[in-house]
C-alpha cells in the first residue's frame, strides 16, 4: 500500500466504456481512486452507490471519482449501467494499476483489495484507506476533504 506523501504511480488503462484513462488526465484536480474486488457484488456496490449519491458534493470540492477493479470492460460496463454510475470504472484486467498501488498481491487471478487513495492535484497521495465500512466510507471520506 502506498503511503501519504508518495508520488502516485502514473497509469494508463481502459475504463468501462473502452476509453483510455491516465492518471495525468487528473493533474490539477483531487482524485479519489477506489479499488474494489468485484463488480456487482455486496459492499462494493454499496460503496459505489455511496460515491454516486454524493458525486455533486465531491464535484463541489473539485474532487473527481475513479473506481478500479480487475474486472472486464463488459462486467464493469454492466455494473456502471445497473447502478447508474456517472464516473469511470477502470478495467485493470492485467493488474498493472492494482499492483502499482498495492491493491493486488500478484499478477495472477487475484481480485483487487478494497483500498481508497486520495491523490492531490500535484499527484501525491493525500490519504490512504484500507479498512473501511463500505456503506459509510463515501460520506466519511467526503467529510475529510
Where are the regions a protein language model picked out?
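Chalcogenol-based redox active-site neighborhoods
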Residues: 1-145
